Amino acid sequence: MGAIGVIRLSGKQCFQVAERVFKGKKLHVQKSHTLHFGSILEEEGRVLDEVLAGIFKGPKSYTGEDVIEFSCHGSPYIIDRILQLLLKNGARLAKPGEFTLRAYLNGKLDLSQAEAVADLIASTSAGEHRFALHQMRGGISREISRLRQQLLDFAGLIELELDFGEEDVAFADRTALHSLVGEIRNM
């Protein structure tokens, strides 16, 4: 339990669902990546909590979809009541990892980055944290992409050698190829 709770809505209906319980500015007309103060209202119109609503319009959001994040007071009662109100108004609870899955399916993360999110959450040491964060930011993906491109370049040079086989020419540097294979093995 913390001082602040964050409740995230993502998907096509997130603005409609949120606006049924949020009193303040109309969220769907606000600019992306903005915060808006307002209240969450109980069904009878009584204020449950004062919140900040963060607006993240797709595709420029974590999931690639429209996203609203309510930052509320961290009371378990308040968080549970807000969740219940959202569920009654058309939301459903996300499955574990669903937001990251949506980000992956919408091309916001590659598989390595999506796996790194779970690693980051589960990290128990500074080293695990650093590695997972590096991977999540695309470090491993960039390295794999770089090595893949080098392999494709070598394959093209070897094809040239095969095409000009009778002329006894070497286009591909065998030492560099062995070095690249060593780099791949050490990953």
Segments (PLM) and residue ranges:
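A glycine-rich (often HGG/GG-containing) alpha/beta subdomain
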Residues: 1-130, 134, 138
